[in-house]
Amino acid sequence: MDKLEADAKEAVVLQEKEVVEKRTNEAKAVQDEAEHDLKLAQPELDKAIAAVQKLEKNDIVELKSFTAPPPAVVMTMEPVMLLLGHSKDWKTAKSVMSDATKFLAELKGYDVKTMKEKTIQQIRKDYFKKADFNPSYVGDRSKPAGALCTWLLALSNYQTVYKNIVPKQVKLAEMQAVCQEAQAVLDEK
């Protein structure tokens, strides 16, 4: 190979290297943006976790003991039941809460990433828009229900941000794959 060919090959390699670096920087920017958004959402998730961590078995027993629960308790338990995949009626709620330990574990182990968009949209529309649906009002009627109200609102807020992060994570994975492939080709040269 003469000098002219070597120079031409080197120019191509340098050009490809610049393209790889540009794509890597673009991927890093997407990653930074996704991480930034996730950090903004994290306090909401922490708030949701803290709300259910405060609940104890006796709190669930208190909720379950209502034969005719205050409307604020019903208004809170219905979306909790929907979110957990149960029927929203009070009879079902009492049945689910009959094993307080299991119910608490279900709340504490709830994975917000599996939240169904249709369900949370329904909850937002049917419950969150009510003036009385706030932790203070609900908590004045039942402290455990107030904590669950906080949990619901915080999970909803987290989910709003999280669903916007998912496309960024998909885009990032695609960009990283392209970068790795381009880098492998470049390394062969």
Residues covered by each model-derived region:
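Extended alpha-helical scaffold/assembly modules in large eukaryotic proteins
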Residues: 39-189
